[in-house]
Each structure stands twice: as C-alpha cells, then as structure tokens.
From Swiss-Prot:
Protein name: Transcriptional coactivator YAP1
Cellular component terms (Gene Ontology): bicellular tight junction; cell-cell junction; cytoplasm; nucleus; plasma membrane
Region listing for Transactivation domain, in residue ranges: 251-448
Keyword Transcription recorded: yes
Known role: Transcriptional regulator which can act both as a coactivator and a corepressor and is the critical downstream regulatory target in the Hippo signaling pathway that plays a pivotal role in organ size control and tumor suppression by restricting proliferation and promoting apoptosis. Plays a key role in tissue tension and 3D tissue shape by regulating cortical actomyosin network formation.
Length: 448
C-alpha cells in the first residue's frame, strides 16, 4: 500500500461510546510529512485505546536495497571521507616492500644463480638456505664428484654448499670478531668503525671463486681433494683402481662432461669395486674352507677295517655326531671338546659298553658318586680312551679308530649297522649287570 493513500481507521467497538476526540479520515497526502507514517500535531498525544492507527512502512525495502548498492558500487555510494594513508604519519618502511633477498628463506634460489652477498637476516649466517651457490670453497667434494665454483652444475641444491667458517680462519685486515653475551658472533670493522653480523670472510671466498679458473693454488687444492678421495677409496677397497675420476685440464682443473655422466661414472666405479670386494671375500672363504678340511681326519683309509658298535644307546648319539661332522667348526681340533663333560648326555657314554669292569667297581668307594664331578680331576683334553676300556668283554670295538682330534665318524659307514638286530650276548650281559646292582647309593654304578 502506498503512503499517499488514506490510512485505514480501526472501527470503534460497539460496547464503547464514541470518544469526543475521534480521529477523522485523513485526505491523501496528509500523512506524508514523515517517512514512517502520518504527521502528528505537536500537542496531540497518542491515540486512545481502541483507535490505534496501523502504519504500513513502504520504505524499508528501499533502504535495504541502498545498503547493498553501497557495497556493490562503492563509487556511486556516499562513503564518508577518511584520512588518507599518506597523511597518517606512518614510517617510510610501511610503504616500501622488503627486498626479495632480505629474508633467509627467500634467498634460496633453486635455479642456481649466485648473486652478490647482500645484508640478510640476523640469523641468516646459520641458515643453510641463505648461503649462495658461489660461496663454497673450490674443490669441494660433492656426491657427483670433485667440482669447482664456476664449473659446478646448476642443479646442485644449496644445502650442499652450507657451511660455517671456523674461528681459526684469519679475518681480513682491520676486522675483529666478538661475541654477544648470548654467544652470537658479530664483526667489528675498525677502518670504517662499523659493526655487522655478516662474516667478511664469506665475501673473500666469493671473490676467490670468481678467480678460480686462473688461480694456481685453487688448482692445487682441487688436485689434493681428488687425490684424497682416491686414497679413501683405495683404503676401503684394496683393489686395482681405474684412472682418476676427473682428469685435470690445464686451464684450471674444471671438470669435463656433464653432471649426469659424472654420476654414472661414479656409480659404475662403485659397482666394480663392490664386485671386486665380493670376489676377494669369496676367495678368502674358499681358502678358509680348504684349510679347515685339511685339519679334519679322513676316515677313508681306516674305513674298511673297523667294525662299528651296535648298542642300544648308540643310535641317537651317532646321529648327532653324523650331523656335526658336516660342520667344520665343531669337529676341528680343540674347538669342541666333548670329552670334558662327565655329568651330561654328551659324556663318554656315547660309546656305551654292555657292562662295567670288575676292577673298576672295586674303586667305587674311593670316587665321588655325586651328580656333579669337579672338572679339575679330569684332564682338560682327553685324546685317548682309558686303558681299562680295552679289556672290556663282549665287544670287538677297535678303540684306535675312535681316537683323533674330534673323533669324526662318517655317517655312510655307521648308518647301515644301526639297523642290525642286537646280539644275544649283549642282552645277556646287560641283564647280568642290572641284576647285580643294589638300590643303595654306595654300590650304584658310576657311568662313564
């Protein structure tokens, strides 16, 4: 409804009499004095109860649209004027952007362009990314080989050139190095009477890199670095070395060839040296194996004359000995002495006999029949069987064939005899021995 139309009036209720001051209908245009509704006379108060006038505001939509227009079209809107930024007394650094290389991280140029050293951040000398590519000393050993400053490939990352100049390097004339209470270094220039965080020795190194191709000391340094690397390679692998990696040129020792070819040559030499080391190691192992086999006693000469033992307790022990005979470290000389054990299953009971000699049983009282026998009473290395074992009845074992450094017994000569039936003589002897034993400990058998 437009504001120009007459405002509707609420009809009076029937229960109430008409008020003496009743608002009369307004003509068109009478209520246009105020944008929000009809104009009231200065002395007129609020309408009485039951005669309120309903105002329909039509300008709210236009005001909201004006707000959007002011935002979307700032030039056409009435924006209040503010003080310009130039007139606000701000420092000059507020309007000047920082230099591109002033920050330590922005100084890392992956393209490899090395510019002049510029004043950098306070902590820039300890940041690996802040060092220029040309700030490394000539002849630096890199993973791709020995390279010089100007001849370095542009694809090298700057972290390979990060370094910290030690304190023993002399300063230029007129310079002095001091440290803050926190331990940070700064440099004093007595000539200009200035103080800086930048190390003046870095500028000297950059100047040396510029004159590297025509400087004889730099060429000598490069040759020394190359010889040092070849010496380290020769110490790690004492094999015949190929020619030097980078032949020096008369102009200053600039490395020839591209970076990829150098890396391929280095990799090829490493593979050749590794192959040579493996071949030498294999030959050394073969020589050790032959030396160990020469120490083992051979049973081929005595194999046809011996008669192996076939007793009930021999099966498992002979299987163990046959397995161990293939290991040169267990049965070679004095490496393994199983004849020292007297209280375990690996004692001399491996060659069990059917009965104990009578002369040995007479000396039982004089021996310690406990579970553990001190090894100090036993010879440290028994290379022969006791003499009383030669007089044992019921066996035809040639004890001379069982003597040796490791008492090696070949499995091919023993395994067929393990399947033979036990003789009746051995069983009778075992029954007689078991029947003669008493339960008391004094007369209990002591097994060897």
């Amino acid at each position: 409804m437009d504001p120009g139309q007459p405002q509707p009036q609420q009809p009076p209720q029937a229960a109430q009499p008409p008020a003496p001051q009743q608002a009369a209908p307004q003509p068109p245009g009478a209520g246009s004095g105020a944008p929000g509704g009809a104009a009231q006379p200065p002395g007129a108060g609020p309408p009485p109860a039951g005669h309120q006038i309903v105002h329909v505001r039509g300008d709210s939509e236009t005001d909201l649209e004006a707000l959007f227009n002011a935002v979307m079209n700032p030039k056409g809107a009435n924006v209040p004027h503010t003080l310009p930024m130039r007139l606000r007394k701000l420092p000059d650094s507020f309007f000047k952007p920082p230099e591109p290389k002033a920050h330590s991280r922005q100084a890392s140029t992956d393209a490899g362009t090395a510019g002049a050293l510029t004043p950098q951040h306070v902590r820039a000398h300890s940041s690996p990314a802040s060092l220029q590519l040309g700030a490394v000393s000539p002849g630096t050993l890199t993973p791709s080989g020995v390279v010089t400053g100007p001849g370095a490939p542009s694809s090298q990352h700057l972290r390979q050139s990060s370094f910290e100049i030690p304190d023993d390097v002399p300063l230029p004339p007129g310079w002095e190095m001091a440290k803050t209470p926190s331990g940070q270094r700064y440099f004093l220039n007595h000539i200009d009477q200035t103080t800086t965080w930048q190390d003046p020795r870095k500028a000297m190194l950059s100047q040396m890199n510029v004159t590297a191709p025509t400087s004889p000391p730099v060429q000598q340094n490069l040759m020394n670095s190359a010889s040092a690397m070849n010496q380290r390679i020769s110490q790690s692998a004492p094999v015949k070395q190929p020619p030097p990696l980078a032949p020096q040129s008369p102009q200053g020792g600039v490395m020839g060839g591209s970076s990829s070819n150098q890396q391929q040559q280095m990799r090829l030499q490493q593979l050749q040296m590794e192959k040579e080391r493996l071949r030498l190691k294999h030959q050394e192992l073969l020589r050790q194996e032959l030396a160990l086999r020469s120490q083992l006693p051979t049973m081929e000469q005595d194999g046809g004359s011996q008669n192996p033992v076939s007793s009930p307790g021999m099966s498992q022990e002979l299987r163990t000995m046959t397995t161990n005979s293939s290991d040169p470290f267990l049965n070679s000389g004095t490496y393994h002495s199983r004849d020292e054990s007297t209280d375990s299953g690996l004692s001399m009971s491996s060659y069990s006999v059917p009965r104990t000699p009578d002369d040995f049983l007479n000396s039982v009282d004089e021996m310690d029949t406990g579970d553990s026998i001190s090894q100090s009473n036993i010879p440290s290395h028994q290379n022969r069987f006791p003499d009383y074992l030669e007089a044992i009845p019921g066996t035809n074992v040639d004890l001379g064939t069982l003597e040796g450094d490791g008492m090696n017994i070949e499995g091919e000569e023993l395994m067929p005899s393990l399947q033979e039936a036990l003789s009746s003589d051995i069983l009778n002897d075992m029954e007689s021995v078991l029947a003669a034993t008493k339960p008391d400990k004094e007369s209990f058998l002591t097994w060897l």
